[in-house]
Amino acid sequence: MEHMKLHHVGIVMNSQERADRFMKKFGLETDYMEYVESYKSNCLFTKHKEDETPIELVIPLEGVLATYNNGKGGMHHIAFEVEDVEEVKRKYEAEGMKLLEESAVPGAGGIIVNFLRPRFGEGILVEFVQKLKK
């Protein structure tokens, strides 16, 4: 497998208020926020410079992410940018690993995503991100 570029770090926040406090505490600003239907969450990405990695604050409105870490939120995933999410899925599955979704789902900001299950990522939930062509 070739080297993958870090795309973002995902943190689940159990409320918009907590997300706002986190942003203020660390001098972060919103780049964009979008509702992601497949995860029933508002996903906020921070502004960042060219050589920096953004943070994604996932604010679940309902569903499984609302109960993440007993409803407290916290560190959730790291995301790598890939050319082709479906090709990555095929490669990992050929090695006996499983991803969360049957096929990639839309994410915030013009991307599609899928996640490697934590038991195959050494305990870490790993997201694969493919930017859609404009």
Protein language model features and the residues they cover:
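Short, flexible, solvent-exposed loop/turn segments with mixed acidic/basic and small polar residues
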Residues: 1, 65-70
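Vicinal oxygen chelate
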Residues: 1-2, 13-20, 25, 35, 44-49, 55, 70-119, ...
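Long, hydrophobic N-terminal alpha-helical segment
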Residues: 1-39
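Extracellular structured ligand-interaction cores
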Residues: 6, 75, 125
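Short secondary-structure capping micro-motifs at structural edges
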Residues: 33, 42-43, 64-66
